[in-house]
């Protein structure tokens, strides 16, 4: 069975953060993500550069690692309408709901380190579809 991961999980593969070990353990699973995951991860690394936490060269090297990560990047287009519907239902941004729409399509779940996303999706009809990393 595939598992959907979001950028917050993938970033832990290249940054030393809490739950890094749990994120690394997921690399043994069959992982999928909407193609936007890589842009989101690169944007987060850019923010780390802007804050002076890593260099631009380090960010580029880490994005290269993510490009080669064991994640099947899937097209967003087939899931955008469902993501918009989910976003309006749970009151959470569409870009996160694309991960949820992909998980629903593949009858699986999303693993995230985004507590707000997990809390927004904690509704009876979505039970267990968005899980916090390490829980």
Regions found by a protein language model. Give the residues of each.
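Active-site-proximal, substrate-binding regions of enzyme catalytic domains
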Residues: 42-71, 82
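Hydrophobic side chains within alpha-helical segments
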Residues: 9, 38, 43, 50, ...
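Phosphate- and divalent-cation-binding pockets in alpha/beta enzyme and binding domains
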Residues: 22, 40, 82, 119-120
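Acidic, PIN/NYN-like endoribonuclease modules and their adjacent C-terminal/linker elements
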Residues: 2, 100-135
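Short, well-structured N-terminal submotif of metal-dependent ribonuclease cores
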Residues: 1-36, 51-60, 124-125
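Active-site neighborhoods of divalent-metal-dependent phosphate/nucleic-acid chemistry enzymes
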Residues: 70-116
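Structural signal for conserved beta-strand scaffold positions within catalytic alpha/beta enzyme cores
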Residues: 33, 75, 131-134
């Amino acid at each position: 069975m595939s598992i959907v991961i979001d950028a917050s999980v993938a970033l832990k593969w290249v940054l030393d953060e809490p739950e890094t070990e749990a994120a690394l353990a997921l690399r043994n699973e069959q992982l999928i993500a909407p193609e936007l995951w890589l842009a989101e991860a690169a944007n987060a690394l850019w923010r780390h550069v802007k804050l002076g936490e890593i260099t631009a060269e380090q960010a580029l090297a880490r994005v290269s690692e993510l490009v080669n990560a064991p994640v099947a990047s899937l097209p967003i287009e087939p899931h955008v309408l469902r993501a918009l519907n989910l976003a309006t239902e749970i009151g959470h941004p569409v870009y996160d709901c694309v991960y949820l729409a992909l998980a629903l399509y593949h009858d699986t779940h999303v693993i995230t380190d985004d507590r707000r996303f997990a809390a927004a999706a904690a509704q009876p009809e979505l039970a267990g579809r968005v899980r916090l990393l390490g829980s």
